[in-house]
Amino acid sequence: MCTSIRHDWQLPEVLELFNIPFNDLILNAHLIHRKFFNSNEIQIAGLLNIKTGGCPENCKYCSQSAHYKTQLKKEDLLNIETIKEAIKKAKVNGIDRFCFAAAWRQIRDRDIEYICNIISLIKSENLESCASLGMVTLEQAKKLKTAGLDFYNHNIDTSRDFYYNVTTTRSYDDRLSSLNNISEAEINICSGGILGLGESIEDRAKMLLTLANLKKHPKSVPINRLVPIKGTPFENNPKISNIDFIRTIAVARILMPESYVRLAAGRESMSHEMQALCLFAGANSLFYGEKLLTTPNADCNDDKNLLSKLGVKTKQAVFFDS
């Protein structure tokens, strides 16, 4: 199994990985994981929604879209003091990366000062900072970099071929353009996707291929399991199997050996045994807290119990050089 860092993967190679017998696949992924990381150490990230609901995008999985009638209550931007308290609480809980998100299509110039203030608060607690605020221009990204932003999250969600089954209000190229702006501004990329949208195995392969063939691999690759939201077009989507989810984690690890592969949304429905297999297959990051944006997350005490049983330690914040 190749352990070099590559940016020239071909689709047949990735599909072949998905077809490897399960035990062989996760073993190979685990060995690659051990070469690049301490396999008994995990990164813990926290996530705060600073603006909830009313998003103009029509992503068919999202409770925050203004296009669908969900039970979500729209909320305006949080005030800085509330955010400051959330950051301090995250620090006490052992989180080493603090992420904040807003239900925006894109960053507006008028909000840059507010965003930079949040970044400064995060950095003052000696935490890694990550923002997920929609599309971003190069000029805006440079301002965030100057403010000290370590990461910017902008998921591609799925493959280019399947993308328009998920959203039509922004293009796949829009997403890739933002990723390019983030990279040019020398901010580390956080980008992944969602499993269970109705995509095929080939779509999963193409999604990971797109990420693995970027000029720089994303430093973080969140893999989400669809949490069906009542009122959205995907509320009745069938659940992706545990085996298929773990396979995708393993392939992500093989394609992007140096990236943090994060268990993101949908983890609250996973047993300890499944999460342990995900960690064995190469996942080494997870979100900690009661909810992720608007969806439930695994119980904090349950997470502590899981990591204790597995003998897995949490890592301290590392500030990457771009």
Curated annotation (Swiss-Prot):
A Pfam family per the record: BATS
Catalytic activity field: (4R,5S)-dethiobiotin + (sulfur carrier)-SH + 2 reduced [2Fe-2S]-[ferredoxin] + 2 S-adenosyl-L-methionine = (sulfur carrier)-H + biotin + 2 5'-deoxyadenosine + 2 L-methionine + 2 oxidized [2Fe-2S]-[ferredoxin]
Co-factor remark: Binds 1 [4Fe-4S] cluster. The cluster is coordinated with 3 cysteines and an exchangeable S-adenosyl-L-methionine.
Transmembrane portions of the chain: none
SMART domains, sorted: BATS (SM00876), Elp3 (SM00729)
GO biological process: biotin biosynthetic process
Example GO molecular function: biotin synthase activity
InterPro entries from the UniProt entry: Aldolase_TIM, BATS_dom, Biotin_synth/BioAB, Biotin_synthase, Elp3/MiaA/NifB-like_rSAM, rSAM
CDD domains in the cross-refs: Radical_SAM
Pathway: Cofactor biosynthesis; biotin biosynthesis; biotin from 7,8-diaminononanoate: step 2/2
Ligand binding ([4Fe-4S] cluster): 55, 59, 62
Domain Radical SAM core intervals: 40-258
Nucleotide-binding listed as a keyword: no
Family recorded in the similarity comment: Belongs to the radical SAM superfamily. Biotin synthase family.
HAMAP family for this protein: BioB
This protein's name: Biotin synthase
Organism, as annotated: Ehrlichia ruminantium (strain Gardel)
